[in-house]
Amino acid sequence: GSEMCIRDSTNGIVTVNGHSYEGAEKQTENTNFALLVAKHFSEPFKDSNGYGESIARLSNMLGGGVIVQRFGDLMRGRRSTEKRIEEGLVKPTLAATPGDLSLVLPKRILDGIIEMIYALDKIAPGTANDDTLLYGVEVKFYNMEVEIDNNLETRYKGLYIIGDGSGVTHSLSHASASGVYVARKIIEEM
């Protein structure tokens, strides 16, 4: 089981994150996962981190911090209430303000999250249950991408950039996989 937690950014913005625990004493009945929707902007827009920060600030303004919403309420176009959350099957693991994430998240991002919840429901039935709790927002701030080729190699022969520092990967599993990939490429070239 796992639980949600609060994360403060360096700019005083409160966002959400999750933890999974190995020890039985800290486990809950819940499972948590993040649904991250990447947005790649075209010219002339250049401040994707500022865009993400403004979404997080809006969430903080509307909810005084992290917002929680039942999936069923989101799909019915209504704000969640403490009463509906308390009556639900899923017990919250984070003190958050019941609210309406559709007032915070841009439509394309919200549509991507909803689409993914329904896709997950096909392989993990119950994911799209009315009582599923959505906490928001979680915003990832990524660095600029380093100029690399399809093999993660820079213009300097033999200099590879792997992991999240490359600006290409955005998770521990992707970062690890990029390291394995480059190691295999180097061995192959020996």
Identify the function of each model-found stretch.
Residues 1-5:
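Short, small-residue-biased leader/transition segments that mark boundaries at the very start
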Residues 7-107:
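C-terminal catalytic lobe of FAD-dependent flavoproteins
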Residues 28, 45, 157-158, 165-169, ...:
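Glycine- and aromatic-enriched mobile tails/lids
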Residues 47-48, 171-174:
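Short acidic, glycine/serine/threonine-rich loops at helix termini
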Residues 52-58, 165-167, 178-182:
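Short, low-complexity, polar/charged sequence segments that are solvent-exposed and flexible
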Residues 96-169, 176:
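A glycine-rich dinucleotide-binding beta-alpha-beta segment and adjacent secondary-structure elements
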Residues 175-190:
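Internal hydrophobic alpha-helix adjacent to the cofactor/substrate pocket in enzyme cavities
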